[in-house]
Every structure is written in C-alpha cells, then in structure tokens.
Amino acid sequence: MLKFLLLFFLIPFYSYSGCEDGDCNNGYGTYIWFNGDTDTRGWVEGDKYVGMFLNGKMHGQGILYFKNGNIYNGSFHNGSKSGYGSLIYKNGEKYLGNFLNDKKHGTGILITNNGEENNIRYKFGVKFKDNELF
C-alpha cells in the first residue's frame, strides 16, 4: 500500500509543464508543455520553447518546436511571436517575415517545397493579394 501511495504522489512531478532547463524566469531556458496542459496562447502538450525569457514569458530570441512538426525561430515579445522570424512547416515550406502578437503581419516570403519564392503581405494574420483582402 505504501508503494502505491508513493507512486500516486510522485507521478504528477514527472508529467508537469514547466521549465526543463536553465532560467525560464529572466534568462535562457527550455520550457516544455506536458500532461495535456495548454496556456492562453494556445501552446499545447508536446510544444517546446528554447530561448530567452523575461518575467517568465518568452521574450527575445528563441525557437518554438510545435508538436505538429512546425518550427518557429525568431523574435518573441511578452510571450508571443513578434518581430522577424521564420516558420518552417512540417511539409517543408518556409515563411520568412514579420509577426505581431502570434500572427503574420507585414511583408514576408513563402518558399515552397520546389524552391519557388512568393512575396506575401499579411495584416494581423489575414493574407493580402494585390493590396486587397481575399
């Protein structure tokens, strides 16, 4: 019975979201989301961030590895993707451009799997074509 109780109380400590390495408060660290946890930004179980933190939030340069296979490498501000970054999709396509509050914003380049480069403009995550929404 004692073994069961000990196991019952120790399991939560092995499957929590949190700082896995370094200083995830005000420095450089690794933060991993586990145990089905999500946060208000939508990071989910299996996502991992490696980079700079300020006041416990992603801030500065970092890399965000998504569980779905996508990878964002770039600037963060106050916990969200903001500034210049690259988003590499699991299908091999790449977006290089600006982000604001976790959304593509401003000009960028989409590089397809066959190497074709397309200039793209976004406004708060909405794609523009010929200066008009579509």
Task: Please annotate each region the language model reported.
Residues M1-K3, S17-G18:
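Absolute protein N-terminus
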Residues K3-F13:
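Sec-dependent N-terminal signal peptides
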Residues P12-F134:
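Glycine/tyrosine- and acidic-biased, solvent-exposed loop/turn segments at the edges of beta-strands
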